[in-house]
Amino acid sequence: MGRSFEVRKASMAKTAGAKIKVYSKYGKEIYMCAKNGGGDPDMNLSLKHLIAKAKKDQVPAHVIDKAIDKANGGGGEDYTPARYEGFGPGGTSVIVDCLTDNGNRTFQDVRQCFVKVGAKIGVEGSVSHMFDHQAVFQFKGEDDEIILETLMMEDVDVTDVELEDGVITVFAPHTEFFKTKTALNGAFPDLTIDVEEITFVPQTHTPVAGEDAEKFQKFLDLLDDCDDVQQVYHNGEL
């Protein structure tokens, strides 16, 4: 019983720690979004989307409300976005997005994640040209043609529509996010969108195996442990 309890306790602590990190990241992002664009979701579409995304990831309402109240109060920290690019284990390409109140600290923290696995942080533009900045929507369906026709009729600049195993994925330029979402919701009011995000989609994937795969997973875990890291994009295929 003693050993199993210790293992269970460690697992619970890890789960709790992961939840706290998710809450913290969303809290910071919601705070900055509300501070820059206003705390009313009906007037700030970016905030409205972010709140919906947070709820989907089971972020408690009190975390969301606290971040918005903090922004409305006019006080608090002033975070700025920071993006780092580099080459991860196995020749992978990596983009790391952060929100920081101390750029020097954040750069050193992210750089150490690269260094610890023998990877190399690069300069701005070193790998971002290998990704497409896209709005991505994913939902269950079988008729990708009707989705494409509908979006084109609504004058949405669609990049691609894919159908695989009963799941439709819509790609559009990141600037077309809200236009695409509005068109889908308007044409298909009963549609449940499982994924709706702005992301960096790799143009090609790099297979990672063996020792490189272990290093790559460690690398992702190290970045996940950085308080200022909000999102990591990569082309690694484990």
UniProtKB/Swiss-Prot annotation:
HAMAP family according to UniProt: Transcrip_reg_TACO1 (MF_00693)
Single GO term (MF)? DNA binding
Q: Which Gene3D superfamilies match?
A: 1.10.10.200, 3.30.70.980
Q: Which InterPro entries match?
A: Integrase-like_N, TACO1_YebC-like_2nd/3rd_dom, TACO1_YebC_N, Transcrip_reg_TACO1-like, Transcrip_reg_TACO1-like_dom3, YebC-like
This protein's major location comes to cytoplasm
Q: What is this protein called?
A: Probable transcriptional regulatory protein VIBHAR_07036
UniProt-annotated location(s): Cytoplasm
Supply the Pfam families for this chain.
TACO1_YebC_N, Transcrip_reg
Q: Which GO terms describe its cellular component?
A: cytosol
Q: Which UniProt keywords apply?
A: Cytoplasm, DNA-binding, Transcription, Transcription regulation
Superkingdom classification of source: Bacteria
The family annotation for this protein states: Belongs to the TACO1 family.
* GO biological process terms held by the UniProt record: regulation of DNA-templated transcription
Does DNA repair show up as a keyword for this record? no
